[in-house]
Every structure is written in structure tokens, then in C-alpha cells.
Amino acid sequence: LPPPGLPQRAAATTLAQFPVVLPLPLSALRSAFPVLGNPLNYGRAVALTPKQFRYGFGNAVSEEESQRLYDRYSVAGPGRPLFQAAVANFNPASATKVNTKNPERGPLLVISGELDHTVPSAVAKASYKQYKKNPNVTEFVEFAGRGHSLVVDNGWRDVADAALSFVTRF
């Protein structure tokens, strides 16, 4: 196990894009467009409209549930991380750089939603392939029919159970 102070094990959901993760599906671009569409948003917090939230977060749940999630969880988010992720593959010193081969990292479960528009399955699988090069346990689970809201929508317990099952094995 890793030394004290480092995570002993982790379950990561909807991983942000980092350098060497090449897929960039159109759905991810569309989800990020409310922020990336205006370069001035780099230094701003940007709020999504209910329609934008529905596409990026609530696409795999009913319209009613998406609206409830929007009302409860939607807040303006910083633009900078999206801009950093967008140019990660063009900047070797990117703030999003990840040392996926760190041998001191503990076991990692990468969790994805099959219908996620914001971090599409192709991005999650490409991230997993990078993390899989680590000498420690790395596993991947994809939840069928689930979107980016998978940790807060009506099926959250399935995700929590999978994460708990993973971390209690180590």
C-alpha cells in the first residue's frame, strides 16, 4: 500500500481529460461549449442554463429529474479547468498532467456512465488505459444507461455500492 498521506485506494468518477487521453467526442465539446465558446470565460465562473445542464448532466434521466438535479446542484463553475483540459494535449506542462505510473498510488476504480455526454465513455476508457499501466490494481466499470449525473441521480446507490465494494477489497 502507499505510504501514509497518500490515498490507500480510490474510486474516481467521470475523470477529467488529461494529456495523452486523445478521444474528444462531439458530445464532450457540446457539453463544454457554454464555457469554451467564450474565451473570456477562462477567468470566470459560468452557470449553465437548465437546457445546457440537461444535455451535459441530466441526459440519462427524465426531464423532471434533470430539473430537480439542476435546482438542487447546479452552481456556476470555474472556466479555467475546462480550458486547461481542452489544451492539455498541446501543452506538456499542462496543469492537468497526471503521473498515471506512480508506483505509490493505491488501487483505483475508474467509474463511467455509458451515456455521459460530458466525459463520454471513450474518454473514460482512454483514461483507464493510461491508468492501467500502473503496477497497482486498476479496474474499470461502466454503468449502462447512465449519464454524468450518475453519482447524484436516482441510481446513485448502485455507483456507491460499486465503489464501496471495490475499496473494501483492499
Give the positions of each predicted feature.
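Flexible "cap/lid" loop of the alpha/beta hydrolase fold
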Residues: 2-41, 84-88
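Short beta-strand/loop motif that positions the catalytic acidic residue
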Residues: 103-104, 110-112, 116
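Conserved alpha/beta-hydrolase catalytic His-Asp/Glu region
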Residues: 45-83
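Active-site nucleophile elbow and catalytic-triad environment of alpha/beta-hydrolase enzymes
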Residues: 72-100, 106
